[in-house]
Structure formats: C-alpha cells, structure tokens
Amino acid sequence: MRARSLAALILSCLALGLAAAPAGAEEGRLPAPPDLPVRGVWMHPGLFGPVKADAVEKMRTVLDEYARAGINTLIMLVKNTSGHVYYASEIGVPDPAYGWDFFGTFLAEARKRGMEVHPWFCVFPESAILGQVRQHPEWLISSPKREMVAAVNPALPAVRAYEIGLMLEVVRKYDVGWVHLDYVRYPCEPAEPFFGFDAETLRLFKEDTGVDMATVKARDTGNPVWNVWLRWNTGRVTVFVRELKAALAGTGRKVRISAAVFPDAVNARVMIGQDWAAWGREGLVDMLNPMIYTNDARLFETLVREAVACGGSRTIVCPGIGIGTSHNQNTPGGMLEQMRLSRTLEAGGVVFFSASSLAPPFLEALKTRQ
C-alpha cells in the first residue's frame, strides 16, 4: 500500500478486482449522510514536499480543507518502507531531503485544528538497508535458498526491539496518543510466505518446538510440521504487538495502537503471519483498519461485517476506504455508500487511502454529508 519498492509484490497477493460503482451510489444520487466518529486519512510527507516554508503553507491549506470536510484523524507517515524516518531521530535515519523536523511541524499544525494524529510506521520493510539494519544484515529475512529479502525478521528479538525503539522515541519526543502500525507482517509471495530460514530463527524455532526445520523436506500445508512452522512465525508478529503494547504502557502515558491490516483475517493469518483477529480478541490493539480497497459494495459489506466481529468489544474497527489505489478507483458516491455501510455495521469510523487521491470532488461530498 505504500512505497512502490514492495507494493507490487504485496498487492499481487490480494487481487480484489475492480467492479462497477455500487448500487445506490450513482453520481448525482448520493446515499444518506454518514455520521461516523472517526473520519481519517493516511498521509505521506511527499504531499507537502521537502521545502519547509512551502510545506507549512500547504499543510495549513490542506488541513483547513480537511477540517471543513469533517476529517478529524490524520495518519501521517513517519517511517517508510525504505527505512527512512520523517522526525527528529537519534535512532533511525532521516530522509535526507527533509533537513527539518517534518513530523513535529505537522503535529503542531494538526493540534491547532483539534485533529488526532497517528504517527504511521511501515514496521518491518527496510528496503534501503540503512543505519542499524546495515550494521546487522543478519536481521534481514533469508529464504530457504539464502536469498535476502528487504525486510527484517519479526522472529528475531533484536529486530523487534529496534522497531519498538523507534516508536518509543516518537512517543517520548512528541505529544501523541497513538502509534499506527503498517506492514506489521511478513512479506508475501503467492506461492510461499517469506518467513526467515536463517540459523538464528531456526534455532529459536527448534528451542520452542523441538523441530529441526532444516531437516523438513515437505514444505506444504499437508505436512503437520509445516503448519507448526506457519503458526510459530505468525506468533512472532503477535509477540511484537504484545511487546509494543507493554513498552508503551511503560512510558507512563496512555498511548493507543492502531493497525492497517489486510482485509481478510483468515487469509492474512496464513499468508503473511498477520493474525489481526487475535489482536482484536486480546485487545492488543485499540483500532483495526482493514484495507478494504474495492468498489464492490457487497464485498465491502461482507469484509467490514467480519472485521467488526473480530474487533468485538475491545477494539474499534475503522475500515480503510480506497479512494485511488492499485485495487480500485472510487467515486464520491461510492465513498459515501461505503461510509454508510460502515456506520450501519457499527464500525467506529473510516479512514481514506490516501491524501494524494482525496481530490476536491471527494472533499466536497464529505462537506455536504457531515
């Protein structure tokens, strides 16, 4: 969903076909007004650019427009899939194009308008292999053929500590009440998930299960041992979320967790080790944002209903509505229909992907439907 370097691979795993605009959402015939508590948008620093004076001017213009459209939640990227960060960091590597504290400046402008800000982390991708990741190549996922993947391995405690350290740094430097997780999963590939087959991961797996994965030849779901391997790796991602929750609690502040997740909980658990249904049941996250990027109203409704059930009473669900994505190109009417469905299904709100696609016709539709 984010940087192009990994997007093609990830999006190939989940082909939600384009469909015609949903019934009842034709242009000129808009659905009933939505009334949702959370009206959010995913945002990238590139929308504003690296020149501070120009960026600040555009921030003010865009956020004023958003306020008029009833947008109250901003999910702003602070770590991209290359590993660069957009805040004043002593741990991570700032994007060299931004020689100033982009996030701090943006946060101040959002606060003036009473908007909630979620610093958004693309957690495990590290495509540029920067900083500490460059110093620790053993952190990268290694395939059975010893091919390196441009993402770090959630199974390794040092990796989890590094990524959590970045999040704690933001929480300690800035007055934020949320941390937003994206790419909190393994890389996906249609034939086989890219779990780590490095020596340390295999040692940890054997220590926990007694199984020497290096001796397993039949790597398919017909093999019970392979299923143990899938479950164990999925569990490492959940361990990360659990460790993050504990670390945030240790700051002495109330900092909540939101997470962008794949739209189907069952497939996500098996294909990418992202058991977000369990996170909802356990209350490990406070908000789930399943990315349901489709124009098919019935499919959208089905997936939102399933997601809300996963959230239960402990986690609010605010589905991601695709405005302009690789999966769909929405319309203002289609957007409003999906908002209406979300409200009917008792979702806690919606989040739009993304700011770069939220053109004036969409904002005008939001202004008239508050």
Language-model features, listed with the residues they occupy:
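Active-site-adjacent "subsite" loops/lids of carbohydrate-active enzymes
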Residues: 33-56, 118-174
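The substrate-binding groove and active-site-proximal loops of carbohydrate-active enzymes
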Residues: 44-53, 88-100, 147-161, 225-237, ...
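Substrate-binding cleft of secreted/luminal carbohydrate-active enzymes
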Residues: 284-302, 307, 315-370
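Bacterial N-terminal signal peptides
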Residues: 8-19
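Catalytic domains of carbohydrate-active enzymes, especially glycoside hydrolases
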Residues: 57-83, 173-177, 285-287, 347-349
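Aromatic-lined substrate-binding rim segments of carbohydrate-active enzymes
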Residues: 63, 80-122, 232-251
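Polysaccharide-binding and catalytic clefts of secreted carbohydrate-active enzymes
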Residues: 65, 145-282
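Acidic-and-aromatic substrate-binding clefts and catalytic sites of carbohydrate-active enzymes
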Residues: 48-57, 79-84, 96-98, 126, ...
